[in-house]
Amino acid sequence: MAILVSGGAGYIGSHTCVELLNAGYDIVLADNYYNSCPTALERVKEITGKDFRFYQADMTRRGDVEKIFQDCPDIDAVIQFAAYKAVGESCKKPIEYYSNNLNCTLNILDVMREFDCHNFVFSSSATVYGDPECVPITEDSPVGRTTNPYGTTKAFTERILNDCCEADSKLNVALLRYFNPIGAHESGLIGEDPNGIPNNLVPYIAKVAVGKLEKVHVFGNDYPTPDGTGVRDYIHVVDLAKGHVCAIRKLTQNPGLVVYNLGTGHGYSVLDVIHAFEKACGKELPYVIDPRRPGDIAECWADPGKAKAELGWQAQYGIEDMCAHSWNWQSKNPDGYSK
């Protein structure tokens, strides 16, 4: 059995490849390096001491996907990470987001059907819940009231996968709704390395801490939260990666379609994260309050009980470890993978 990991050189993908290899799986990795770079793959090999097949391929091109399956007839499951992923950018470029994110998955599903592959893990997001009526959020919370095109692409893809499972009783799908992944592998060899100025909070804080950016921008301090800043469920990327290994194991039981929240069940504000990072790096970090960003919500955290009960999965790291590992990565790699 081999697992195709599309978008496997990216932040979550690379950490998941480490966990899959360490768990004894054979992987086929595909990436077009749009949001990633080859160095990450060399670091994955360094961490695990294992090799894997790699294709520089674009999942929006069906021919690229078909070639991978033709070359690798042992592929028995797919973990689909390949997507554009910036909430703010999606509000400015909705057409690009809908085209890319939907077509990546549609092409993979079409080729899977052709090659008789029936196991699919989808990298979904808590953004499918939109602005929740209440927290913590369970898997039964309303879906589809999204507040940005990125989240809508995830909600649309979930609907597509639901329809595919209705039409094909052999298809097994795990929808993994991530909350807010941060942190890095404890080795400091792989981590989050965004192109240009980071869109997400923790890599931005890390760039400020390492002296690459001047100050942290806090978008809004007038939310109905304890300190006025947005509250999120931050999850260590290694915990998240291990959740994918558990999902692959679940699919071997032929469950049809299953849905899991992957979060810690704890909410932390933007200021909580800044202060935790200050503790990790041993310095005070300057920040300014800016207006809210379009598409942002006040608070969001998970009820991860279903994943614990059905997958045997539970997050192990707290916010202090997440920030410490992010700082370890950033301080060892101040310019990301480029140096």
Feature locations, PLM:
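Alpha-helical scaffold segments in soluble metabolic enzymes
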Residues: 107, 204, 246
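Short, solvent-exposed loop/helix junctions and linker helices
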Residues: 6, 99-102, 150-151, 195, ...
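A conserved pocket-lining segment of Rossmann-fold NAD(P)-dependent short-chain dehydrogenase/reductase
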Residues: 90, 141-143, 180-235, 261
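N-terminal Rossmann-like NAD(P)+-binding domain of SDR-like oxidoreductases, especially those catalyzing
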Residues: 1-184
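Alpha-helix initiation/capping motif
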Residues: 58, 68, 130, 142-150, ...
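C-terminal substrate-binding subdomain of Rossmann-fold SDR/epimerase-dehydratase oxidoreductases
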Residues: 207-339
